[in-house]
A protein has these predicted regions:
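Gly/Ser-rich catalytic serine loop of serine hydrolases
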Residues: 152-154
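Nucleotide/phosphate-binding catalytic cleft detector across ATP-hydrolyzing
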Residues: 1-12, 16-41, 46-148, 161-169
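A structural feature that tracks compact, well-ordered secondary-structure segments
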Residues: 157-159
Length: 169
């Protein structure tokens, strides 16, 4: 049985994935190129290279907009293709830790992975500010408050962390 573990950050501009077992970090532009509104032609950096240069029948866009999922089906296809390419197709039974923006609905991000063809073992949702604090090697479980500022492509989030959670964001 496969025991891959992935940490995912779905940003408006970049998709960032950490693969724990391989200790590798993958970052791609969060873009997809769709031909005739039905066929995914390219994704990630390859689709970004087509941005504003594609003919009318090829739409190049981001599946995320201001931290919200604009297209769950294209995001699922993008994520699955990207992970299969970089893990040699061994996704069944993987665990996913998803950095969740505080103003987002949990259901859409859970569905993004659970309803895909990847058949994950588990999907864990983590507040994005807590994930950022852990990524910065900050002890977020202390009683002392820590301010974390996440400056993204379309949104900026200021949060105070204490005792393993988000106090205010």
């Amino acid at each position: 049985m496969n025991n891959h573990c992935f940490g995912c950050d779905f940003g408006s501009y970049h998709l960032k994935i950490y693969h724990k077992d391989a200790d590798s970090y993958l970052m791609q532009h969060n873009m997809e190129a769709v031909q005739d509104k039905k066929t995914m032609l390219a994704y990630g950096d390859e689709a970004y290279a087509m941005f504003e240069k594609a003919p009318a029948n090829i739409q190049v866009s981001s599946p995320m907009s201001y931290g919200n999922l604009a297209s769950i089906s294209y995001m699922q296809a993008f994520l699955k293709s990207l992970l299969e390419k970089n893990t040699k197709g061994q996704l069944r039974g993987s665990e996913f830790f998803v950095a969740l923006p505080t103003d987002m609905q949990e259901r859409s991000f859970t569905m993004l992975i659970q309803d895909s063809n990847m058949k994950p073992k588990a999907v864990y949702l983590i507040d994005k500010p807590v994930a950022a604090g852990l990524g910065l090697d900050i002890n977020v479980k202390e009683a002392q408050g820590v301010m974390v500022i996440d400056i993204g492509a379309e949104t900026t989030e200021i949060s105070v962390l204490s005792l393993g959670g988000t106090v205010i964001s």
